[in-house]
Design a protein with these regions (language model features):
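Short, structured "edge-of-domain" segments at secondary-structure transitions
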Residues: 1-282
Length: 282
């Protein structure tokens, strides 16, 4: 067995927005004293940035979920090892991604133990919950269906959950909807899900859509940023738990000056955040 010949060591896995992936031993990034200069991490093309970053073991699985609703699986050691400053290898040379297919979420795991679930959110407001163990199946080289994505819709996020977590969905209209995932019954892989958030309205004449989904944990905040660079952080406690399928509560009032909502994520105090504009400014 080839795996018996591969050392079980901690790796840093990175995937950039333009689709370059690599693994690197965690030891490469040696711990420094406070005030250190850091080490050069990666040479990126202008405008590119690291979108997914995980620390995991060479023997872990990596699950790659795409906007088309497919999932691909690799062992960490199957990902090309790069140098500290290399961009890595184009993911299309590792996974058979189709034109227009993008990785939206990466979930590393050692096993597919019971009692864990995956929550899926689509741009059209659907939410789906599936037992994690359903993905412990031989995955063909060209991937398998993780969620059935309807015409005109796409997958925007996947999160690992306990089965009883609060889910927060955020729409382009600046609203956030919070509900407990127990309101969503577990479904099989080849299903579309149920309405998690109502996005039937329009924003500046274009259809509203879900931009982000995350697990709302205690002592966290929701951070949102608009297209013109305005940011706002509010306590997760400001968003009451309601039933699924609502339009949500206003998280930020959008104006022509602020622009539309560009993104949202759950953060903790003292975390550093990095913003990259469409023209590559950081």
């Amino acid at each position: 067995d080839i795996e018996d010949m591969i050392a079980d060591q901690q790796m840093v896995i990175s995937l950039t927005a333009s689709g370059y992936a690599k693994r690197l031993p965690l030891a490469t990034y040696r711990q420094q004293h406070r005030g250190g200069k850091g080490v050069s991490g990666m040479n990126l093309k202008e405008g590119d940035y690291i979108e997914h970053l995980h620390i995991c073991s060479t023997h872990d699985y990596l699950l790659f979920f795409t906007n088309r609703g497919k999932v691909y699986r690799l062992k960490v050691y199957e990902l090309p090892e790069g140098s500290r400053t290399s961009r890595g290898k184009a993911l299309v040379n590792v996974l058979p991604l189709r034109e227009g297919e993008r990785v939206m979420a990466v979930i590393p795991t050692r096993d597919f133990s019971e009692g864990r679930y995956l929550a899926f959110a689509t741009a059209g407001g659907l939410i789906k919950k599936t037992e994690f163990k359903q993905y412990n199946t031989p995955i063909r080289a060209d991937g398998i269906i993780a969620i059935k994505v309807r015409e005109g819709d796409e997958l925007v996020q996947v999160r690992l959950t306990s089965g009883s977590d609060d889910i927060l969905m955020v729409s382009r209209s600046g609203k956030a909807s919070r509900f407990n995932e127990e309101k969503v019954r577990a479904m099989g892989r080849d299903t579309s899900g149920v309405q998690g958030m109502n996005v039937s309205d329009e924003v500046d004449g274009t259809p509203n859509r879900v931009l982000a989904m995350d697990v709302a944990r205690p002592d966290t905040d929701l951070f949102v940023v608009t297209e013109n660079g305005y940011g706002k952080r509010t306590s997760i406690d400001d968003y009451p738990v309601k039933g699924r399928g609502t339009k949500g509560n206003l998280t930020v009032k959008l104006t022509a000056k602020k622009g539309g909502l560009a993104g949202a994520l759950i953060v903790r105090e003292h975390q550093d955040l990095l913003f990259i504009s469409v023209n590559g400014m950081v």
